[in-house]
A protein has these predicted regions:
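Post-transcriptional modification and biogenesis factors for structured RNAs
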Residues: 1-172
């Protein structure tokens, strides 16, 4: 099971987009307080559309509360300070749940946490002049990298609204 963990997220639209990614991939979403928004904010609802009702969302009072409720050896941290790319990790060798931790939009994950977990810190390769990518894009990229390595377990690539053969019905 993949768990996406947002450390003190600030922007409701990003969290809404991540809710959509988590629902579509059967990933569990953990939100670590304080949050920079309320869970009923319109931007959160608009970005998450109607997916929130089908997404397993767990809210934690702080980092310590999250760790206490989710003791795991499989924490992976997405941070601009990571020295490895997600593809440098072999997620097929991980037994048990995989936790993908992303930081708040303004300052990331608390550096005191990162300091003790440098071997599982990762960053997305980009040009040297780019500081960062959007949080929800980073979440989608890393979730799908893990799923790619695991061969997309339990997921379908059939188009759900128009059917798998929709393109075959188009006349030239």
């Amino acid at each position: 099971m993949i768990h996406v963990v947002l450390f003190e997220p600030e922007i409701p639209g990003n969290t809404g987009n991540i809710i959509r990614t988590c629902m579509a991939t059967k990933s569990i979403l953990h939100l670590i307080e304080p949050l920079g928004f309320s869970m009923d904010e319109k931007h959160l609802k608009r970005a998450g559309m109607d997916y929130a009702k089908d997404c397993d969302i767990r809210i934690h009072k702080n980092w310590e509360d999250f760790v206490e409720k989710n003791p795991a050896e499989h924490y992976f941290y997405m941070t601009r300070y990571g020295k490895k790319a997600p593809s440098d990790f072999d997620f097929t060798k991980e037994e048990g749940d995989i936790y993908l931790i992303l930081g708040k939009e303004s300052t990331g994950i608390d550096r005191r946490i990162l300091k003790h977990h440098q071997e599982t810190c990762m960053s997305l390769p980009m040009v040297a002049s780019a500081r960062s990518l959007n949080l929800s894009n980073c979440a989608a990229i890393i979730v799908y990298e893990v799923l790619r390595q695991l061969d997309y377990p339990g997921l379908s690539n059939t188009e759900v609204l128009k059917g798998k053969d929709f393109l075959d019905t188009i006349e030239d």
